[in-house]
């Protein structure tokens, strides 16, 4: 963890705040009601995790695209194809009738991590990348929404 640049670690951890907010507003009745009153249902409970999770999957597609675009050998086309999969996964599965969006989110994060591992072994990422992504992915899975909010209004 010492090799991760401070800015990358701080910003990565800051990106987890909405996920922890989703968990907090799922379990704490006071935060739940405050969030409903001052924000909206979209920023409360598992809704925030699903919405923000979709954004993160698309964001990670862009990051992976950038890694792939920097090489000029046979890894580039495969990397570019792999890099768009998380965004396409989010688009086609989150609102479809075939898979629960909560399960889709978890599968999407695991898929991104698998691509991260592949890119790391292809040496497309910085040396510290997989350590950071391991920490963030663990936290994402830990805060993954359940199909039911814990608190009912």
Regions found by a protein language model. Name each.
Residues 2-8, 13, 17-53, 73:
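Interfacial loop at the N-terminal end of multi-pass membrane proteins
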Residues 40-45, 61-73, 123-124:
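Short juxtamembrane and helix-loop transition motifs at transmembrane-helix boundaries
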Residues 66-92:
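Helix-adjacent hinge/juxtasegments
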Residues 142, 147-153:
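Single conserved hydrophobic/aromatic residue that forms the stacking wall/gate
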